[in-house]
From Swiss-Prot:
Sliding clamp subunit that acts as a moving platform for DNA processing. Responsible for tethering the catalytic subunit of DNA polymerase and other proteins to DNA during high-speed replication. Keywords: DNA replication, DNA-binding. The gene is pcn2. This is DNA polymerase sliding clamp 2. GO terms for molecular function: DNA binding; DNA polymerase processivity factor activity. Disulfide bonds: none annotated. One of its GO terms (biological process) is leading strand elongation. Coiled coil: none annotated. InterPro entries: DNA_clamp_sf, Pr_cel_nuc_antig, Pr_cel_nuc_antig_CS, Pr_cel_nuc_antig_N. It comes from Aeropyrum pernix (strain ATCC 700893 / DSM 11879 / JCM 9820 / NBRC 100138 / K1). Pfam families: PCNA_N. Heterotrimer. The subunits circularize to form a toroid; DNA passes through its center. Replication factor C (RFC) is required to load the toroid on the DNA. Belongs to the PCNA family. The keyword Ligase does not apply. It comes from the Archaea.
Amino acid sequence: MFRLVYTASSKFKYIAQTLAKINDEGVFEFSLDGLRAWIMSPDKTSLAILEMPSLSFEEYMVEEEMRVVLRTDELNKISKRATRNDDIIFQWNAEEQALEVELRDRKLGFSRKFLVPATSVGAEEMRRLKLEPTVSFTILTDDLKAMIQDVKVVGDFAEFEASEGQVVVRSQAEEKEYEWVMKPGDVLLSLEVEEDAKSIYSRQVLEIATKPVGAAESVKVSFASDYPMKIEYTFPNGERMELYMAPSLAG
């Protein structure tokens, strides 16, 4: 029913790792214009939406659109077996009702094949979130990762407070405190503030956002007061990943 050839195996490792971190399984949609995935954590505090347009694949052939539930943990294990010389080929095995993942070495020509059985076929249509954040900023992925690692040293929660001209990230616990004041031209690549905002997020949930950093240079972060945070990655070939983090009432 479909055959997809993806040449950026190193990038897919970051993608698969992120999806598996949120949940062991998720909905995958193979449509005429691209591959999409929708993964929500069991406690509903985090959500990942992946979009890989057909042009991001070397070969993209879908005869009939379909949605299936697949094990993201199995995809993650398989992606770890890929080398930088491997193409990743996705095909649907109708007889086994499974996703066939082939790792084909471009230089040597040999292949390794794996099967990921579908938990279910014909899953519900994926829903998109409609949020209205009041703050958006862009930051280098390395700086985002450093920030979250800093917070981990201090506490379990991070407070984000934005006002005109700056975003301040704070954390505190057991007589330890952390604060990072970020401004455009300093750390922030861009900043838009429609309304001052303050919200707290779990550090454990935020750590999920560090998984794709090796595949993108910058990331867009959006939030509002006591409102879900959206973290958006755009990769070089048009792939996109949106991560949504629920605010925390603790902290």
